[in-house]
Regions:
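Mid-to-C-terminal alpha-helical segments outside catalytic/metal-binding sites
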Residues: 2-13, 24-80, 85-88, 92-108, ...
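Catalytic pocket-lining loop regions of alpha/beta-barrel enzymes
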Residues: 3-5, 132-135, 148-156, 161, ...
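Conserved residues at the C-terminal ends of beta-strands
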Residues: 23, 112, 187
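Short aromatic-enriched loop/helix-cap "lid" or pocket-rim segments at secondary-structure transitions
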Residues: 26-29, 121-124, 229-232, 283-287, ...
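Surface-exposed, active-site-proximal loop segments in enzymatic domains
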Residues: 76-82, 117-132, 167
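Active-site mouth loops of central-metabolism enzymes
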Residues: 82-91, 127, 155-167
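Short glycine-enriched loops at secondary-structure junctions
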Residues: 112-117, 221-227, 347
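Short glycine/proline- and charge-enriched loop/turn segments
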Residues: 124-129, 233-243, 358-365
Length: 394
């Protein structure tokens, strides 16, 4: 008798392709010299005006410390814990996190930052000492290795890099790869930082190094200046509006990778579009193929040896979490080899049931979303693709 969808999912060691570590308040102050740089080192302190803990760079208010700690919180986002200590300990405690993973049937989690890459543009805008910013990047990368070491085999750390300085980036690639990082978190819109666009050949030595080291490039939504939608319509509506539209930035990044010739020039380099969903991808690829054929690209650019959809199938992955029918349809249209599953834990709209969330537990959601798919497709999406991409032992 053929196994049911539920049986296949229950037998699969799920690799969650997008989760976040809520950075502890002393992450940087415990690793970067406050004797040398004082309060310029990122730190958390109470802000009387907003009545909450904030991350500060010097005297500049950057980010609510509890903003991303939405899992099991009792208020709808953008409301959030006012103090880190008020949030669920599984958001930031590595040992407690493993218990959460076991409860929800997740074998391993790929780890992304909150403040680590998303707010670095603030430092660049402050013209901070480059040595300080580099020290912060290294401190985060080292912290993540130490955090992951509490549960070997359960966490997949991804490095951040000082991308504004390519020489420093090349050095950090080697240092963090040797320490155990499995991929690179990279901004999708370099123009937000006053740097050349992704497709500019300025980045070619970075792509070449990542390709040689077999390190994937991971584009997480929001890793730049986040455009806000519907802000005049109310906090909760604006939050939903913005969260819905952020995938567009990653769609533009995929177009840059393909039309900009990056996939063509670096055929063994893998890319991941993170927290951006998958339902829209078949349309975008069909559109890219159509435009490719009907804009004379094949005739005028013989260097492109594949269609856009074929470059995607060879080198680009994307992740889904809440989708049901659109995820199943995308898998059926694209094939299962480049689709990953994520929960976005512990972000507010991730797959964590709670008093202010309609989410089901991950496996319960997957029973519906993947119902009827062949066993090899389910295993690809839940385990095999991520294991291959991040070079994990089975």
């Amino acid at each position: 008798m053929a196994a049911t969808t539920r049986q296949i999912i229950d037998a699969t060691p799920i690799i969650d392709a997008d989760t976040h570590v809520i950075e502890p308040a002393d992450l940087f102050t415990s690793r970067v010299s406050t004797t040398k740089w004082g309060e310029l080192v990122p730190h958390v302190r109470w802000d009387e005006e907003s009545a909450e803990e904030l991350w500060y760079f010097g005297d500049k208010k950057i980010y609510a410390a509890g903003l991303a700690s939405g899992a099991r919180w009792h208020e709808y986002p953008p409301d959030h814990p006012r103090r880190l200590a008020d949030s669920d300990s599984r958001n930031w405690d590595a040992v407690e996190r493993v218990r959460h993973m076991d409860d929800f049937g997740v074998r391993a989690q790929v780890l992304y930052p909150n403040i680590g890459v998303f707010q670095v543009n603030e430092y660049i805008g402050m013209n901070a000492d480059p040595a300080l910013v580099l020290a912060c990047v290294q401190a985060y990368n080292d912290f993540l290795i130490d955090w992951s070491a509490t549960a070997p085999g359960r966490y997949v750390p991804l490095m951040t890099v000082p991308f504004w300085d390519l020489d420093a980036t090349m050095t950090e690639l080697v240092r963090s790869r040797d320490a155990g990082h499995k991929g690179i978190v990279f901004p999708a819109r370099m123009e937000d930082f006053g740097l050349p666009a992704l497709h500019d050949q300025h980045w070619d030595r970075f792509w070449a190094a990542a390709q040689e080291m077999q390190l994937s490039i991971n584009f997480h939504i929001g890793s730049g200046n986040i455009p806000m939608f519907g802000t005049a319509s109310g906090r909760h509506l604006g939050y939903a509006w913005t969260g819905t539209m952020l995938f567009q930035l990653n769609a533009a990044a995929i177009a840059s990778l393909i039309f900009g010739g990056i996939c063509q020039r670096f055929p063994s380099l893998d890319f991941v579009s993170v927290e951006s969903g998958v339902g829209w991808i078949p349309f975008v690829l069909e559109s890219m193929d159509w435009q490719f054929h009907n804009s004379g690209v094949i005739a005028h650019h013989p260097e492109f040896d594949l269609l856009p959809s074929e470059y995607f199938a060879r080198q680009i992955y994307s992740c889904f979490w809440f989708e049901n029918a659109s995820a199943r349809s995308a898998i059926e249209q694209l094939g299962s080899e480049h689709v990953l599953f994520e929960t976005d834990f512990p972000h507010p709209t991730g797959l964590t049931p709670g008093p202010a969330s309609s989410a089901m537990a991950p496996r319960e959601h997957l029973y519906q979303a993947l119902d009827g798919l062949p066993a090899h497709d389910i295993r690809n999406v839940l385990h095999d693709n991520a294991a291959r991409l991040y070079h994990l032992d089975s």
